[in-house]
Amino acid sequence: MQIAPLLHVGRGVMAIIGGGGKTTLMETLAGELSKKGKVIITTTTHIYRPEQYETLLDADEAAVSAALERSGIVCVASQAESGKLCAPRLSMGTLAQLADFVLVEADGAKRLPLKAHASHEPVIPEEAQRVIMVIGIDGVGKTIRETCHRSALYAQLALVDEETVVTPQLAARVVNAEGYGDRVYINKVESASDYEAAQAMANEFSCPVIAGSLHQGVYVCLH
């Protein structure tokens, strides 16, 4: 089963934001979309260097074009002092001219399922035609303090304290309060109880909602 059609991923630039699972979603989409055209994966913040793709650092247009001809999927970025990769020297608009699909990880969550966004986040490229909000269903049933990146801000947006247990409705309340994303993907939905929680969450959104498991490769449209 493929997730790209359910998320209506078209050609051009797409940003992925939210909780844990963004990198896996980006890599899953890259694999699917590479059957339809050339794919660039990149970031506007920081990501780990992907082992399975050719990575170009501070490359010019000619180098990117040549790599895409060789590989079909290429990571384009710069080297950050932290050892991670950061935003590339080339603009997103330029990358979109070189590849059919540009997938951008535009957020960080410290590998936690849920997050609230500080004033400087997310870093969504102005060229983005689709913004996917990722939510980890494994954050439901745990306290905000233990499962949310920027937990104090998350609690503030939810109008509760950090020891409050996250419910599907509470998680949706925070996403709706922030107003980011035109699609929601609920990840790690792998059991009947996960599905029930995901459906309860989806009922709170007005935008399309997809739920599933990137690990299992199974997805369903909930809204």
Stretches found by the model and what they are:
Residues 19, 106, 136-138, 156-170, ...:
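G-domain G4 guanine-recognition motif of GTPases
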Residues 76-116:
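Phosphate-binding/switch loop-helix module in NTP-utilizing enzymes
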Residues 12-16, 71-82, 106, 157-159:
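Short, basic, glycine/proline-bearing loop/turn elements
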Residues 118-140, 150:
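Inter-motif core of Ras-like GTPase G domains
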Residues 59-64, 146-162:
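Acidic, Ser/Thr-rich peripheral helices and adjacent loops at domain boundaries
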Residues 2-35:
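Walker A (P-loop) phosphate-binding motif
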Residues 30-79:
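N-terminal phosphate/diphosphate-binding loop that engages ATP/GTP or pyrophosphate donors
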Residues 16, 39-43, 75-78, 102-106, ...:
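General beta-strand structural signal in soluble alpha/beta enzymes
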